[in-house]
Design a protein with these regions (language model features):
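Conserved functional micro-motifs across diverse proteins
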Residues: 19-156, 160-205
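Sec-dependent bacterial lipoprotein signal peptides
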Residues: 1-19
Length: 205
């Protein structure tokens, strides 16, 4: 084997090792990693006077949040994480650009309009969310609107979609066609490269 071939082979071996090597994190580090603004799992879209923050929530993230970010042992963590497979979940936070007013109250003309807005989020908005999974078009399997009652400057939609796979093997693109504030179609995509990063993370208990 000549020197050039030997060098190429060595580089390929190093690449393969780096692809399979696990990156260790504590639960706190994992949480920060998933929630990082500007990271691959948290997307922010500004549309008119509103800001939509779309947070992808992997199974381990959900399981850890349910357990207040503290597991008794790794078996408990793995069992709950596996049970959450097959459905992808997102938190969609809806706020105003100014941050001074809750979206339900922003420029509202009165109680009747406020109630119409609230009713939309409670009973209609789920129909206007779509998840594009490769060439598949999926509608929500779970939807909850978390009303802050104007106590803070944002409200939250929790929304889930059932996949044909246990874990995503195609990019995820969440779209919301706004029928309330006329801000158009809101899009947030989680790329396959980003999703594959999760395979190389080892969370320590």
């Amino acid at each position: 084997m000549n020197k050039v071939a030997s060098v190429i082979l060595s580089v390929l071996v190093l690449i393969c090792l780096s692809c399979t090597e696990k990156r260790e994190m504590t639960l706190a580090q994992y949480r920060n990693y998933i929630e990082a603004k500007g990271g691959g799992f948290c997307k922010t879209v500004t549309a008119g006077p509103l800001i939509y923050t779309v947070q992808y929530r992997p199974p381990l993230y959900i399981a850890a949040a349910e357990h207040k970010w503290q597991f008794n042992d790794s078996t408990e963590m793995k069992t709950r994480t596996m049970a959450l497979g097959g459905i992808v979940w997102f938190n969609v936070r809806i706020g105003t650009v100014s941050g001074a007013t809750n979206p339900l109250k922003s420029d509202v003309s009165g109680v009747a309009e406020y109630n119409d807005r609230l009713n939309y989020w409670l009973t209609q908005a789920a129909n206007h969310f779509t998840l594009y999974y490769g060439d598949l078009e999926l509608k929500p399997q779970g939807y909850v609107f978390e009303n802050s009652y104007g106590l803070i400057s944002e409200d939250v939609v929790v929304i889930g979609f059932r996949l044909p796979d246990t874990t995503p093997v195609r990019p995820l693109r969440l779209e919301y066609e706004d029928q309330l504030y006329n801000t158009g179609i809101i899009k947030a995509e989680i790329s396959m490269d980003v999703l594959q990063e999760l395979d190389h993370i080892q969370v320590k208990i």
